[in-house]
Curated annotation (Swiss-Prot):
InterPro entries: HATPase_C_sf (IPR036890), HSP90_C (IPR037196), Hsp90_fam (IPR001404), Hsp90_N (IPR020575), Ribosomal_Su5_D2-typ_SF (IPR020568)
Chain positions covered by the region annotation B: 335-548
GO cellular component: cytoplasm
Cellular location(s): Cytoplasm
Keywords: ATP-binding, Chaperone, Cytoplasm, Nucleotide-binding, Stress response
Quaternary structure note: Homodimer.
Protein's name in the database: Chaperone protein HtpG
Its biological purpose: Molecular chaperone. Has ATPase activity.
Family of the protein in this entry: Belongs to the heat shock protein 90 family.
CDD domains named among the record's database cross-references: HATPase_Hsp90-like
Organism phylogeny: Bacteria, Pseudomonadati, Pseudomonadota, Alphaproteobacteria, Hyphomicrobiales
Predominant location category: cytoplasm
Chain positions covered by the region annotation A: 1-334
Region spans: C: 549-620
Amino acid sequence: MTTTDTAPQTQPFQAEVAELLNLMVHSVYSETEIFLRELISNGSDALDKLRYEAISKPDLMEAGGTPKIQIVPKKAPDTLSVIDNGIGMDRQELIDNLGTIAKSGTKSFLTKLTEAKDGSNLIGQFGVGFYAAFMVADRIVVTSRRAGSTEAWTWTSSGGAGFEIAPASAEEAERIVRGTEIVLHLKPEAAKYLEAYQIERIVSAYSDNIQFPIELVPEEGEARQINSASALWQRSKSELAAEDYKQAYKSIANAFDDPAMTLHYRAEGRYSYAVMLFAPSTKPFDLFEPQRKGHVKLYVRRVFITDDADLLPAYLRFIRGVIDSEDLPLNLSREMLQNNPQLVQIRKAVTGKVIGELESLGEKDPENFAKIWDAFGPVIKEGIWEDYERREKLLALSRFTTTKGDNRTLKNYVEDLRDNQTEIYYLVGDSLERLKSNPKLESAAARGIEVLLLTDPVDAFWTSAPLDFGGKPLKSLSQGDVNFDLIPTTDEAKDEQPKPETDEALVIATIKDALGERVSDVRASQRLTASASCLIAGGQGPDRALERMLAQQNRGGASKPILEINLRHPLVAAIGRPGNADAADLSLLLLEQAQILDGELPEDPAGFAGRINRLVLRAL
C-alpha cells in the first residue's frame, strides 16, 4: 500500500451523483422509509456475491460468520447502522460504487426523478438505492473489507460535492472481518427510524422474503431475527396466499406496485426448476433502454448466480422474478450460461409458460390484462417481429385500437369480416387523432371495413414482416394497391352523385408534369371518396410510416411516394379543364396537402403559402 493510498483523500462526486444527492438531501418524497429497503437489498446482493465467489474460493467463507444482515439503532447520538458480512469492497470499489453511476440512461433517470412526485419506485428500479439514505441522514460513514483481504477502508460523505476515503482504524478493521457497515447519522426528523417497531414494520413490508436472516440488534438485549428469510418460490402454491405473492414480488423486484400477473410453478422431469415470475402493473422508466436488459434472476439450488442470463426473450423484459434450477452446476461461469443447453431448454419452456399465462389472463381477467397491455403492449409487439416461432400466439395476444373500438383482438376482427373481404387492413401513424381523420380510411369506411389504427413506434417495424392471421394477410392502407371492388358500400355510404366528366389521362399527365421528380407516380385512387389526394408507398419496400421513422434516425432516406388522386373531387377535375392557368399550382397543392395530412411539412413552405395566396386572391 502506498503512502498516497493510506492518507485520507477527498474526491469529488461524478456530476450525476452530485445531482442525485442534491435531490436526496432536499427530498420532498413522502416514502423516506425506502432507504432501509434499499440498504437491505444492497446487503443481500453482497451476500449473494459472496456465496457465488465462494463456490470457486471456499476459503472466503471461513471467517466472518454465517451470512446475515444486522440493523443496529443507537440513540445519543442518533445513528442507524446496516451491516452485512457479504463480499465487501476494497478502496477502488468504494470509489466506483459510491462515487459514480456507471450506467446508461442516467440523464433520463434523473429527469424522471426530478419530475416525479414520489421517486421511491424509480430509485429502486435504477439501482442507486444507497443514495436514498441521504433522505434521512446528514452524514454517512461506510466501512468495508473485501472478503479475503487484510485491509479495510472507510468512505465518508455529508452529501455535498464529494467524499473522503481513508484506511479504516485498527479497531474498525478488527471489528469488520468481512463485509460492509453503513452508519447513518440521522437527521432530527428521521429519529423515528430508531424505534424497533418502525424497523420491524419496514422489514416486514419490503424485505421479509430476503433469503438471508435480518437481525435487529437493540442497545440492550440480544439480537433477534425479524424476517422470515424464506425462498417462497421453493414452496408449493397451496402454502401461499395472495398477500404472500404481493410481498414476494415487492421484495424480489424492488417494487412498490402490486403485480398484475403471477406465475408460480415447479417443473419436474428432464430438468427440475422452480419458477416465480411477475408482471408489474406499472411501467418502469427504463423499459425502452437500448440494452433491453431482462429482470429475471437465476438461482442454482437457492444460490444466486446472475440477473443477466437472458432467461426470457427481450420482448418479455418487463417480467420480474426468479428461476431456481436444481440441475445447473454452481461453478458455471456467466459467459458459459448463454450457451448452456439446459438453460436454452428452460428459457424456451418458461417463455411458453409466460405467454400461455398472458393468454389465460386475457380471457379470464381482462381488467388485469388491460393493465399489462397498456404498460407493456409495445414491448410484447417487438416479439411479433423477432420471434417467428411464437408470432401467431403474440398476434392473438395483441390488443388494438381500430375504427370499431378499443381492445380489439385479431380474432374479433376476423369474426367481423365483411363479405368478400380477404385481408386485415391497418394504418400506421404517430397520432390516433390524425389516423382517425386520415383520407386513406375513406373507402374502407364507406364499406364498413374495420381498420387497425397503430400508433406505437414499434408498429412500423413488426408490420413490415409478412404476416397473416387465420389465413388472412395483413395489408397496409398506405402501401401498394388496394382493391375493394367486391366489397359493397354500406347503405349509409351510398353516393348517387354522378362522376364528373374528367379526362383521367389528361389530369394524370398534367399533374406528373407539374410535380416532376417529387413523386414516383400519379394514379387514380380506390382509397379516397371525399378527399382530393393522398400519398402511399409502392408495393415493395417499407411502409411510409417506417420510411419516415428510419429517415428521422438517419438510417436511410425516404423513397419517392406515389400520389393517388380522387377523380371525383372538384379540385382534381379542375386540373383537367383545358387552358386552366392554375393547373400547376393545383397539382402542387394536391401533393402538399397530402403531405400535411400525413404529418409532414411541404418541402417548400414559402412556395406553398404563395400558391394558397394566389388561388385565394383569384377567387375574391
